[in-house]
């Protein structure tokens, strides 16, 4: 796209109609000063709407009319030639201005159709022509860049990067965020109120539900108690009555049994004394000694039996070893006997084979002598046979090669015929498979195109997701940095506030606060917060009582006082919470100027209310002294200015000294701290949301990466398949061609082989006849008797030689076996001698075992004899004592049983008499209680079976006490709580939704800010790169763009830093006029290179440059004109010489500008 034509009607210095054709390349407009050459540029700006009238060097619109007429019409038409990529053709823009005194109308047309300026700018933007761009550079634009503030210079980059669009989106999101926050705050306030109401109703509701439940339970328990009481009393009366009757019978039986037991006890004692006397007389001590002796002997006998058993076990083990030894000796005897027999047999066999071998050797020698005699007599016959054999071999040597050749030809013909058939079948299959391969190749190409599309789409999605991840990570890093800075600043401010608070109070109060005494809460000034506007008034109202120390109880106060005494730290006033009156009643204030009670203007914990009442009482805060004086004597008052008016009429006032380190109320948290905390909360939520979104996007990117890899593998597989199909098709084509050539050559070869086969058959016929004839003659010769005998002799000689070699081998094997047998026999004899030695040892051991056994049995017999004698003595004594002792033991046990029973009987009789009196009293009381209760109600539900009356009464008493403790009760709280909870739940859901929307909007704002920064830095880096190369080309120096605040570029401006050749590095403000122009032009060219346009127009931008710099500028324009159209207004020779063509502008006699075209030499050549 380029400017094709400019048509001007009555615009500034131009007359009724002027048409200026324009061509691509580099065009210079030149002419005398005041001739109107710059008006061509102004006309271009006017038509395209790229500047205001002031930008076109006109104070008002009427100045744009030819010769400044008050009335008239101006029209400028610009025609663009479109490129083929844009559809070709032309784009025509026309602007008309009608001025009628103070009134004027301006209209635009686009390709002959009316349009608005916005429509025109949108159409021009599609062709990279922007109102804020640098398509047209006027005389003041270069100096404007030099003079403009750094922030405005940075805003040029903002325009290029599209920052305004991001700002618009951010502003829209912030407006929406404000609306969301307003709705959220409104709902939050309602929810807070509902939560406070629910907290109150929750307690009342639980109390009411418990009260209602207890009343129902108590009613039911009362009915059960009456029923169980009646049942219990009736059962008790029946039981006591039966017990009284049974007890009378039991008491009578006890009396009778006691008399009988007394008589039996006396009789049993007499009998026991008689039995004891008899036992002592019979010798019980002697029997005990005999039994002890017998037990000792029995123990010794048991030891002897154990030793005998051990000996028997050893004998059995030794006998087992002896039996095993005898078995081994028997086996060895049999083995040795076998060795003897085997050796005899082997010796006989060796002798037999030796004799046979000698005999066969003699026969062999005889046969050899006979064969030599037979060979001497048959020599002539052998010579004839040899000649025939040689003749036969010669014929056979001629015949066999020819026959083999003939056989090979036959085989080759058969093989070639078979191969030809197979190749014809293969060629038919290949030709039939061509169509299928073509279809498969087409399908493979379609699949390949689809796979490439899927892969490109997946990669595009992956790149987009990665770009989003990169943007999110950038936002995350920026927010984390901001959070760190905010948290550090917040910590610093809070530390300052804490240090200030810790410095409050006197030495005495500081000693108490730092002592660590349990129950010390703090100073009044530390336990309350006030707003800044009320701080002075409230501190005057409290006075020195701000340093009063609030403690848990009077014991803590006493402990603190003793501490101050011991440390001589001074005095302090303590406010024990357990002794202060916590109630307060303050009348409603209606007096003019009264702000409120001091207590209502302080924020404090409700548990410290009594302490703050003690300090402030009913003090009222008034706006001014004048208004407070009207109420003097009615209230204790303090004014906002710090005057104090007592009820007694005393007034205190004057100037207030600035507080320097003294104690005072803590101010409510400053707004900047609250905003900082809120921002930190927002940052935490945004970072959490960003982390979740990053996780989701990374998971999505991972899935897309896997999908891309799968698509890549699929694409590779399809490409491989397509290539394989192509290779198969090419291979089959080559194979078909090869088969056709082979079949043709095979046919020729078959014909030649058949001819050669016929020739060989003709040559073989005579040879076969000669071979048959020679064989017949040889057969006749070999049928003679001499030949037969000679053959038999040779055969017999070979058999004898074989037999002799076989017998020699057998003889060597037999001798080896005999030697091995002798060796085995020697080993067996050695083992037998060892076993015989062990058998002699066992005989000695057996004799020893017999002797030890005899000794053990002798000792056992002696022990048995002693035991028998002792047993006889014990038996004799037992026969005499057993009967008497048995009778004594029986009598003793019987006497003890009678005495025990007598004592138990007396105790039971006394207890039963006591119980009888108790039963009679209980019967009377139960009957009286039953009469008082009366009969139970009929409709009472049955109580649990395992519930006793005592358990029920205890439960009823406990519930009754709980019920009384709950009163009074609001029973309507149950329904009110449910309604409030339902409303709170609905609002909480709405609030959660709004919070999510708020987080999304905040994140959208941060995303836009990140993208805005990224777009700006991308544009800045690109423009900076272009600026460095352009400045180096224009000035032979180096320079760069510098941001005043690189960390936050939008908070500062943009500076041009240049280093002209031979000079130190300078900023724009310190340069000369020419250096400033070159630097500004480099900046303009860098902007143009970043956002290229189809044409550029310069209006005398070289006016402040010297000849050398104009030459460099003209050279640069000449280079860029190769790809972009340039229209330059200039009076400088280097610029004109570098141009492709020139347009001359002069002032005609009629006072309007006249345009002449000049074709330069460069263009002509």
Curated annotation (Swiss-Prot):
Residues 518-630 form the SMC hinge domain. GO terms for biological process: chromosome condensation; chromosome segregation; DNA replication; sister chromatid cohesion. ATP binds at residues 32-39. CDD domains: ABC_SMC_barmotin. Residues 161-503, 672-901, 946-1010 form a coiled coil. The keyword Endoplasmic reticulum does not apply. The keyword S-adenosyl-L-methionine does not apply. Transmembrane segments: none annotated. Gene3D superfamilies: 1.20.1060.20, 3.30.70.1620, P-loop containing nucleotide triphosphate hydrolases. One of its GO terms (cellular component) is chromosome. InterPro entries: P-loop_NTPase (IPR027417), RecF/RecN/SMC_N (IPR003395), SMC (IPR024704), SMC_hinge (IPR010935), SMC_hinge_sf (IPR036277), SMC_prok (IPR011890). One of its GO terms (molecular function) is ATP binding. Keywords: ATP-binding, Coiled coil, Cytoplasm, DNA-binding, Nucleotide-binding. It holds the Pfam family SMC_hinge. It is found in: Cytoplasm. Disulfide bonds: none annotated. Required for chromosome condensation and partitioning. Belongs to the SMC family. Contains large globular domains required for ATP hydrolysis at each terminus and a third globular domain forming a flexible SMC hinge near the middle of the molecule. These domains are separated by coiled-coil structures. Homodimer. This is Chromosome partition protein Smc. The gene is smc.
